[in-house]
Amino acid sequence: MSRITLSRFLIEQQRKAGTLPPELRLLIETVGRACKAISYSVNKGALADVLGEAGTGNIQGEAQKKLDVIANDFLLDANEWGGSLAAMASEEMELPYHIPGEYPKGEYLLMFDPLDGSSNIDVNISVGTIFSILRCPEGVTQPTETDFLQPGTHQVAAGYTVYGPQTMLVLTFGSGVHGFTLDREHGSFVLTHPDMKVPERTAEFAINMSNMRHWEAPVRRYVEEMLAGKTGPRGRDFNMRWVASMVAEVHRIITRGGIFMYPKDARDPSKAGKLRLMYEGNPMAFIIEQAGGAATNGHQRILDIVPTKLHERVAVFLGSKEEVELVTRYHSEQQ
């Protein structure tokens, strides 16, 4: 049986009752090509002098790695001329990126975290790209930040690429979740993980335990119960994982189950969380829900949150449905 490439898969989906518009198909393929280029740069590492700091900072006040800038440029350059987009937005840029006047404009908005987990680059741990696609509001020809401020339920597609021992693109456009592995010999993403599902039950959790003293009471209660293992109220043992790369954590969870948590904490009560809603929380929540899992901010479904700014932050609890529902219930009981 012949292998199914990303291009073939998308074309076949387009033919099935027209569930995937041609312009959206082309946009997803273009994002995939940009991710291939990022993968090659990440893999070269010190050989291409792409490790270390860039000497600049992003809108979040974070020091940029060289590969943050390189990945951001790859995504901008690959997508600006294709005719599918009205504008783009990135973790690395304060304002939306407008399509240059010499290129045709399309009906979609693309948002991305070009290189999630980039603090891991220099120590050779998996990093990744996260992206979200929305429709541009009808009649808008020069999108502003306001046009991006749509709830996650409005996403028409989302995905991530994990750059690890293999490079994998994981994608949804509202009809399940499918994983594609990069065949470097042929330069194509190939369908290797069709219809991915998150197990409902799990014995693994991912959280940065060093911040425990700053957590709200419901999070401490939930984690302490898991740490108590068989002798505690849960009656079974759990294992903890922490990679400090959201893409790597989510990929593990979608592959074998688990819960990923990045709660708000007391160090800065004005911030709703650490992760960004529009290009981290929303796309990952869309993917996890399409795979049968759940995603909340501790109080409500992440996809239902109406954003108020492009770089808005959010607390994140996502993964196996049973665990996400439990920690969310603990938050509601605390109110």
Swiss-Prot record:
One of its GO terms (molecular function) is fructose 1,6-bisphosphate 1-phosphatase activity. Homotetramer. One of its GO terms (cellular component) is cytosol. GO terms for biological process: fructose 1,6-bisphosphate metabolic process; fructose 6-phosphate metabolic process; fructose metabolic process; gluconeogenesis; sucrose biosynthetic process. Belongs to the FBPase class 1 family. It is found in: Cytoplasm. Mg(2+) 1 binds at E91, D113, L115. It is an enzyme of class 3 (hydrolase). It catalyses: beta-D-fructose 1,6-bisphosphate + H2O = beta-D-fructose 6-phosphate + phosphate. Its cofactor is Mg(2+). Disulfide bonds: none annotated. Mg(2+) 2 binds at D113, D116, E280. The gene is fbp. This is Fructose-1,6-bisphosphatase class 1. It comes from Chromobacterium violaceum (strain ATCC 12472 / DSM 30191 / JCM 1249 / CCUG 213 / NBRC 12614 / NCIMB 9131 / NCTC 9757 / MK). Substrate binds at D116, G117, S118, S119, N208, K274. Keywords: Carbohydrate metabolism, Cytoplasm, Hydrolase, Magnesium, Metal-binding. It comes from the Bacteria. Gene3D superfamilies: 3.40.190.80, Fructose-1,6-Bisphosphatase, subunit A, domain 1 (3.30.540.10). Binds 2 magnesium ions per subunit.
